[in-house]
Amino acid sequence: MSKRKSCVSILLTLVLVLSTFTFFGVRSEAATVTVTSVAELQQAINNSSGETEIVLANDMQLTATVTIPAGKSITLQGGVTLTRTSSAIAFDIKEGGSLTWQDIKLDGNAKDTNYKSAVINNQGKLTINGGEIKNVRSNSPMVGIVTTKGPNAVLTMNGGSIHDNYMSNQFNNVVKITEGASFFMNGGDISNNTLEHSGSSGLNSAVGVEGIRGSSTMEMTGGTITGNTAEYGGILVGTYSTNYTMQNNFSNPAHYYSTGTLNLKGGTISNNTAAVLGGGIAVNGTGKLTMDGGTISGNKAPFGGGIGVVDYLTSADGKRFGETRWRGFFPASVTINDGLITGNEATMTAVTSQITDPNAENGVGGGMYVASKEVYINGGQFTNNTAGKQGGGIYVASVPYKLQMGKTLVTGNTATKIGGGMWLCPTGSATTAVTNGASFFDNKAGNGAENNDTGSAGDDVASINKQDPASQTLILSNNGLDNWLVHWYEDGKIDEAYLGNSDGSPRYPNTVSPVVDRGTLDGITEKIALKAIVSDEGKAAARNVAKVIVTGNTAPRGGGIGSNGAVAFGTDPVNYDKVDLTVSKMWENSNTSHVTSVTVGLFRITKANFDAVALTNADGSALDTTGMSESEIFQAKVDKLMASGANTYAQIDQVALSNANDWKFKFVDLLKYDMVNDAQDTTNPNIYFAREMDTDGNWAANDANATFGAQQIRASYKATKNASGAYDQVIKNEEVKKTEIEVTKKWVGDRESKVEVQLYKNGNPLGASRVLEGANNWTTKFDNLEVRDAGATEDNVYSVREVGEENGAIKIGAKHYKVSYSAIDQDGKMTITNTKNPTPKKDKPPTPNTGDGFGRGMTALFGMSALGLLVLVYNKRRRYQ
């Protein structure tokens, strides 16, 4: 085949393929159609094939319902306004149909809606990316201005605004998600809508996610729901009433357990007002809420300014069905893992006749109201919420409801009457678990204990006499977050009023004398007001590990948390075996200028880890502990442990010792055993030890010197096992005794220009040598010398020697000196005397001869003769050889 024929074949094939695509309607992009009337719009929709963009060329009067049939995928744009002219549905999206709303404005023109109807009825897919839906005025019941209904119906809102609509009947919503539908809100706003709630009106909310005839869901990751007014505020999750639910769900077993679910991950729900429950979100009956993010702020309601939760278990129907069965139908469950609930208010927003709770005449639960046994707060922040009566941050309604909170910090809250951090009514209970419970501190009742405000009581906790002591108790662990101790003290007293007021007693620390650390309060049923004292280090640790923060909230009672039901912080165990120990400080009687306060830290380690600390010599060999006392071995292990940088021990408290507490502190109700998986390990007891902090912020080791103020102090520790099995600790501080030696050089007979002297300690040189010379008057002073080393049993021996001196003598240049040392006197002075040795005498010259010289002459003559004879003999011998 020629190349030309081959190319022609390829082109023909390509044309055939493209023709086939066109024949079957395959398109590379959506078709665009422009229309100028509602009739043209509907015709364009009906004629569309595949994705179609319809541009509205001008504003239009909606004289008929626009229908999106199954199989149609339409995008509307053009930025124009569509105005309703009747109460009919404006847009009807059938199951299988899809409408994307780009930038169209839908003006409701104050027109009504029909019974059980909508303005936009969506049983398919509706995506709102922009535009507006506004100015609808509905007086009919069971209406959703934007209704998404059915298991295959989906509403997605990425932008746009649904705002300023009005509704005045029951079971209504601006946005209704029902019968198994789904709503994804990623952006845009639903704002400033009004739903009447007086007279026969009510049972409505701006957004409704209904658990009716199927489980509906909403996921919110962005956008804003704000400024709406209704009986249930911003979002209702669940159902409006138990009767309404049973009528709709119990006729079909498939719908028995229908729920409405909100997954809140982002966005803002703000400044909404509810007449009854949940200014921001109402989780009612069949509702479920999971909050992993987002902000709920500035909302108002009598029950739960931010969030209100009700399961109706205490209703007549709830009692008739029984708890287990009822909770299957009406879980009203909430799980909060993260997010911010702030600035909400529990206050009266409706007539009192609509409020059935006698304790709510001024609003309860500024941040959250709990009337359910399925509420878990694992994380998140409740800040700056207020309640007119009880529970500024959170309020638990009654028995049998229970709120479960994990790793909670309650701080900086205020009650004008009692219980700045938490208040429990006569039926209220609270428990804090040992290892993952809660820390309370720096809350305030009235003007606080620090100002002795006797008109209030209980800066941190107040609890009223219990109606049923067998089941209603207060259990507060003194083991706070990150295992730092919380010291509980009585802080004023409470009168006999049902909800409790201060009886005018003095505040902490003058409520009881002497002050008593209550330790862990286990099963308290009588009225009590409490102040929590936590070290600054313990506060920092709590802030670091807390997952739930309750702070800045206010109410007359229970600024942070109020409860008529139960609050459980953390998981088991609540009860545990305990030990006590006392740390005492001793000063020398002679030391009257020591510091007035000393910081002591308490540390904890398990016995298994403590036993693993090996004592060694400097060369690494095992230390022979024979003859060492139990306390000496104990302290040696502690010192090695702390010097090693190991992480097997942890500080759990820090207190000040001073004259005010007689230089001692008793630590009570400490954990006897290690906790493993929230249970006691009775095979592994805890060991506690104390160390004091010096002025430089260092922990002073045993038998070591440390600075305390202007003094050098030697700290020593003694541990003695007490009856509980812990070790009482005595810290003895002795001022380090110092001495000095002043050395003066004395010369006898002669002197040099300078000499050097060396200080010795116990026979070994100490420091550099010193020069003695005329410039320093031949005197120097060695000062700050320790009389006895830390840990030693004998005093040091100091001496000074002249450098170069040996055996009492020294040669300097050509001169010889004798060196003598005086003893060190009681004033620490000594003298080194150098005495010049006399110059050695020269050998005596021969005595001159005064005789006649005869003897010397004869001697010379004899010598000369002998020499001559020897020469003669020598020569003769050579000749004959």
Residue ranges of model-derived segments:
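N-terminal capping/linker segments that flank leucine-rich repeat
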Residues: 3, 26-48
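Surface-exposed loop/turn motifs in large extracellular/passenger domains
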Residues: 68-75, 91-110, 118-137, 142-167, ...
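Solvent-exposed loop/turn and edge beta-strand elements of beta-rich ligand-binding domains
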Residues: 16, 225-227, 259, 269, ...
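Sec-dependent signal peptide cleavage junction
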Residues: 20-33, 848-854
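Bacterial N-terminal signal peptides that target proteins for export
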Residues: 1-11
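Bacterial N-terminal signal peptides
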Residues: 11-23
